[in-house]
Amino acid sequence: GLFLNTVKDVAKDVAKDVAGKLLESLKCKITGCKS
């Protein structure tokens, strides 16, 4: 139903956000956090 779709959308957004943060910290480890 609609509620399940909303939960899926939110989960997708959260997953994207978490993946982005993980990617950033990974980059940070590799490059030595140079901005």
UniProtKB/Swiss-Prot annotation:
Record's subcellular location: Secreted
GO cellular component: extracellular region
Family that this chain belongs to: Belongs to the frog skin active peptide (FSAP) family. Ranatuerin subfamily.
Principal cellular location given in the protein's record: secreted
Cysteine pairings via disulfide bonds: 28-33
Keywords: Amphibian defense peptide, Antibiotic, Antimicrobial, Disulfide bond, Fungicide, Secreted
GO biological process: defense response to fungus; defense response to Gram-negative bacterium; killing of cells of another organism
Coiled coil (UniProt feature): none
Protein task: Antibacterial activity against Gram-positive bacterium S.aureus. Shows no detectable hemolytic activity towards human erythrocytes.
Lineage: superkingdom: Eukaryota
Tissue expression as described in the entry: Expressed by the skin glands.
Protein name: Ranatuerin-2SPa
Keyword Secreted: yes
